[in-house]
């Protein structure tokens, strides 16, 4: 069994915030793969489904970001899971918008949701880092992550979320390479190698050679004798 955790803050006020991209990722997976309706459990919203024989539970903690670990810890204890069974989807300031990376273990890099999870289950869980870009200065980070995605960002955000939905079965199976391939097919589809069709260059106009001059008629060779010519004259 796998526990997919999406990080965010509860309520319509935060629904489209950059900080809530983890919630958005789980909503996409649930919609794409026919998971059960969301219901309240483990201090959050939970939905259940399967990818083949692998059971997957989706969890969106409703404890607010800074206490996300409380909800994750409850679910882990209930299902008797290990940290390696947990995959957390979260916003990542240090990745360009639309980029996605998978990482296991390591620090929380100042992310309050990850810091809380570290405190409850340790660092040895898998993370799906979803790039939202950086505002440029640390003093602007809080306002930036708690602001809605701009309309101009809708296209790459939709591509990223669809790619996550496409690759979710591979992620549950432990094949992060194929998961990343599925995401890339949405966010950076390969360009056609055919290119624009070639057009034949018009043939250069060529002058037709002038017709060969007909050889001039030459008088027949005179073979008659003078006497014969005289006879022919009086005929």
From Swiss-Prot:
Pfam families: Pept_tRNA_hydro. Its main location: cytoplasm. The record marks 9 as: Discriminates between blocked and unblocked aminoacyl-tRNA. The active site is at residue 19. Transmembrane segments: none annotated. Its EC number is 3.1.1.29. It is found in: Cytoplasm. GO terms for cellular component: cytoplasm. TRNA binds at residues 14, 64, 66, 112. It is an enzyme of class 3 (hydrolase). GO terms for molecular function: peptidyl-tRNA hydrolase activity; tRNA binding. Residues 198-207 have a biased composition (Basic and acidic residues). Residues 186-235 are annotated as: Disordered. InterPro entries: Pept_tRNA_hydro, Pept_tRNA_hydro_CS, Pept_tRNA_hydro_sf. Keywords: Cytoplasm, Hydrolase, RNA-binding, tRNA-binding. The record marks 91 as: Stabilizes the basic form of H active site to accept a proton. It catalyses: an N-acyl-L-alpha-aminoacyl-tRNA + H2O = an N-acyl-L-amino acid + a tRNA + H(+). GO terms for biological process: protein quality control for misfolded or incompletely synthesized proteins; rescue of stalled ribosome. Belongs to the PTH family. Hydrolyzes ribosome-free peptidyl-tRNAs (with 1 or more amino acids incorporated), which drop off the ribosome during protein synthesis, or as a result of ribosome stalling. PANTHER family: PEPTIDYL-TRNA HYDROLASE. Monomer. This is Peptidyl-tRNA hydrolase. It comes from Dinoroseobacter shibae (strain DSM 16493 / NCIMB 14021 / DFL 12).
């Amino acid at each position: 069994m796998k526990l997919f955790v999406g990080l965010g803050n509860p309520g319509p006020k935060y629904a489209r915030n950059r900080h809530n991209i983890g919630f958005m990722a789980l909503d996409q997976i649930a919609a794409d793969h026919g998971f059960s309706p969301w219901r309240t459990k483990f201090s959050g919203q939970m939905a259940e489904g399967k990818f083949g024989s692998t059971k997957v539970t989706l969890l969106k903690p409703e404890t607010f970001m800074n206490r996300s670990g409380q909800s994750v810890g409850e679910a882990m204890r209930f299902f008797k899971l290990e940290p390696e069974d947990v995959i957390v989807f979260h916003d990542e300031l240090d990745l360009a918008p639309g980029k996605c990376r998978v990482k296991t273990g390591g620090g929380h890099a100042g992310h309050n949701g990850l810091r809380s999870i570290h405190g409850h289950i340790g660092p040895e869980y898998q993370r799906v880092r979803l790039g939202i870009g950086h505002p440029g200065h640390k003093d602007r980070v809080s306002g930036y992550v708690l602001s809605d995605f701009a309309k101009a960002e809708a296209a790459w955000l939709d591509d990223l979320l669809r790619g996550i939905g496409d690759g979710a079965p591979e992620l549950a199976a432990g094949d992060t390479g194929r998961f990343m391939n599925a995401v890339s097919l949405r966010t950076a589809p390969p360009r056609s190698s055919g290119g624009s069709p070639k057009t034949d260059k018009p043939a250069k106009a060529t002058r037709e050679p002038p017709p060969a001059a007909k050889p001039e008629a030459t008088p027949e060779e005179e073979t008659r004798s003078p006497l014969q010519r005289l006879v022919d004259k009086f005929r």
